[in-house]
Regions:
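Catalytic active-site module of serine/aspartate enzymes centered on a nucleophile-bearing elbow/loop
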Residues: 242-275
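Conserved alpha/beta-hydrolase catalytic His-Asp/Glu region
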Residues: 150-207
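Conserved alpha/beta-hydrolase "acid-adjacent" motif
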Residues: 224-232
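Active-site loop/oxyanion-hole signature of alpha/beta-hydrolase fold enzymes
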Residues: 50-95
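Flexible "cap/lid" loop of the alpha/beta hydrolase fold
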Residues: 105, 112-148
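Hydrolases whose catalytic domains are alpha/beta-hydrolase-1, hotdog thioesterase
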Residues: 99-103
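Short beta-strand/loop motif that positions the catalytic acidic residue
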Residues: 211, 217-219
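Conserved HGGG/HGGXW glycine-rich cap/lid loop of the alpha/beta-hydrolase fold
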Residues: 6-62
């Protein structure tokens, strides 16, 4: 698919597959829409699947270097306008869930349902030194001490942050395939830092009671590292009216890629129930 120049100012790359209930997948910090292709494409067998590269990632360009969660939510709404989709099921992983939540709060009529996968509502419910606005200390230190590529390696392949230790030990080739696939269109260092700052400068915990659409909180029970998404998931479930939570056993932050079949089934069952 070609890029589309949106009224939000982004020249946004997207792809659409299949037919049926519209499902928009929003990726994590720095990832492009390509990240979903090894794992989530079966969703297109029964749904209209929409992938895109957020600002600063892949083949999308935007005129400014300062990004916000609000901007990226507006981009998704503008993409739906371009595609003629009145409302869609939004599935956001990590920062993608934050973008989806911002969209749900600001444009509830455009959201049929929201799945927040390994995500959160901002810094307020999170424990630890990672929870400060702007660029977190660990990122600044890692970039200075080890460089950009090693920082990404540590996050995605060399620790249990994304994949559990047992699965990494048993599937080193799959871990490396994942890294080589996503790094091709991953945000570069400048854009990545700006995206992290956007993520850490956003807060919606005080607005969770205003969510009007059905929400599923999807979390791996081992996703309790630096950002402790397990704690964040509990906060989402407890504060969003009517929210449901599904826990994937034996999974960490990267469960869409470590357990794609289970992840896809949860998504499809949820979409069917809220069509």
């Amino acid at each position: 698919m070609p890029n589309v120049k949106l009224p939000t100012g982004a020249d946004l790359h997207y792809e659409a597959f299949g037919a049926g209930e519209p499902v928009v997948l929003i990726p994590s910090t720095g990832f492009s829409g390509e990240c979903w292709k090894p794992s989530q494409m079966p969703i297109a067998d029964s749904c209209r699947l929409v992938l895109h590269d957020p600002r600063g990632c892949g083949r999308t360009t935007a005129p400014q270097k300062v990004y916000t969660i609000n901007q990226m939510a507006n981009d998704v709404v503008a993409l739906l306008d371009h595609l003629g989709i009145a409302a869609a099921h939004i599935v956001g992983h990590s920062m993608g869930g934050r973008i989806g939540l911002e969209m749900t709060l600001n444009f509830p009529g455009r959201v049929k349902s929201l799945i927040m996968a390994a995500s959160g509502s901002g810094l307020a419910p999170r424990p630890g030194a990672d929870c400060v606005p702007g660029a977190p200390h660990w990122l600044v230190h890692s970039l200075a001490a080890h460089g950009f590529e090693q920082t990404l390696r540590e996050e995605y392949t060399d620790t249990s942050a994304f994949f559990t230790d047992e699965w990494r030990a048993q599937n080193p080739e799959k871990v490396e395939e994942f890294y080589q696939h996503v790094i091709k269109t991953h945000a570069r260092v400048s854009e990545y830092v700006h995206l992290v700052i956007a993520r850490h400068s956003w807060e919606a915990t005080h607005r969770l009671g205003d969510v009007l659409r059905p929400v599923l909180v999807l979390i791996g029970d081992n996703d309790s590292g630096r950002a402790n998404h397990v704690v964040q998931a509990e906060a989402l479930k407890n504060r969003i009216p009517g929210a449901r939570m599904h826990v994937l056993k034996g999974q960490s932050h990267g469960f869409p890629w470590q357990a794609p079949e289970a992840t896809n089934q949860v998504i499809l069952d949820w979409v069917k129930a809220h069509a």
